[in-house]
């Protein structure tokens, strides 16, 4: 805890997120030794060139209550927002988590719902393609279950998982997310060509490498304009979609604004397929 408190004092650290699950890496993190340079080795407290395997769970947490007590400790000792990231799978663990929040009156400052679409060139394909629910059903499940247990208003819900384009972001907001995360969008704006070399240290665009030779491909002074344009275009397009739907802000989009079409051409509003759940 002492080390955590010291890091929390860093002005450039705005919040902490505990990764309890990630769509692309259910097995946990894996960093090849060829990417572990002197700086990374110093931060991670390993030898330079040593492969790092991060477990997919916290060894001292075995229940929803223990997870929440740990989050509470970090909130109290760090003085900064502490959130959690999860992947939705079976219904029971989700219900256990939400019930524990209500019973203990302990809530993370935010909770990120990651869909199985979350990608990485440094994971097992079998896991990336098959573990966890895709974002739309995952988000629907979480929002409705949180409403059922009467805790939705206590939570800030972030959505993540291939939210690259404005229409996908609009759907996530309409389902009930408060905000979205987009890693892939910013990576592609920075030059990622999805070469699937993330784990090798030989990323040809310089985005996912610590090798100085390959890093030359990424000029931050040039790429910053592309990233800026991506953000501006995303925001403009989101508000354009909202205006077309007759609302003042993307935050005002609801399930009534989303329509799905089946293979026979029949259209059904999302609000009819998945009516909003009223809390207890």
Located regions from the model:
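Short helix/loop capping segments that flank catalytic or ligand/cofactor-binding pockets
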Residues: 26-29, 121, 251
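Short coil/turn segments at secondary-structure junctions
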Residues: 51-58, 126, 218-225
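A structural-propensity feature for long, helix-poor, extended segments
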Residues: 1-14, 19-23, 202, 206-226
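Active-site-facing alpha/beta catalytic cores
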Residues: 1-100, 107
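Short capping/connector residues at structural and topological boundaries
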Residues: 41, 45, 63, 203, ...
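C-terminal extensions of enzymes
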Residues: 191, 219-280
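Glycine-rich phosphate/ribose-binding loops and adjacent secondary-structure elements
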Residues: 58-215
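Residue-level signal for pocket-adjacent positions within structured domains
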Residues: 38, 53, 198, 248, ...
């Amino acid at each position: 805890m002492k080390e955590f408190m010291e890091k929390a004092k860093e002005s450039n650290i705005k919040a902490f997120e505990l990764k309890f699950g990630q769509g692309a890496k259910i097995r946990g993190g894996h960093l090849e030794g060829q990417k572990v340079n002197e700086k990374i080795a110093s931060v991670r407290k390993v030898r330079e060139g040593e492969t790092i395997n991060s477990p997919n769970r916290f060894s001292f947490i075995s229940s929803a209550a223990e997870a929440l007590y740990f989050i509470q400790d970090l909130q109290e000792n760090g003085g900064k927002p502490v959130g959690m990231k999860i992947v939705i799978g079976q219904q029971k663990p989700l219900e256990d988590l939400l019930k524990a929040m209500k019973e203990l009156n302990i809530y993370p400052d935010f909770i990120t719902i990651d869909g199985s679409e979350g990608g990485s060139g440094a994971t097992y394909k079998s896991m990336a393609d098959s573990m966890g629910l895709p974002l739309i059903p995952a988000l629907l499940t979480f929002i409705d279950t949180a409403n059922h247990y009467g805790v939705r208003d206590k939570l800030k819900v972030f959505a993540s998982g291939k939210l690259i384009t404005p229409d996908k972001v609009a759907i996530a907001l309409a389902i009930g997310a408060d905000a979205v995360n987009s890693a892939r969008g910013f990576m592609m704006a920075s030059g990622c060509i999805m070469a699937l070399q993330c784990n090798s240290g030989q990323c040809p665009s310089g985005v996912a490498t610590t090798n100085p030779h390959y890093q030359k491909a990424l000029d931050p002074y040039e790429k910053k304009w592309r990233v800026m344009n991506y953000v501006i275009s995303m925001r403009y397009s989101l508000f354009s979609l909202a205006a077309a739907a007759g609302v003042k802000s993307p935050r005002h989009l609801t399930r009534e604004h989303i329509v799905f079409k089946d293979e026979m051409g029949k259209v059904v509003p999302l609000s009819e397929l998945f009516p909003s759940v009223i809390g207890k």
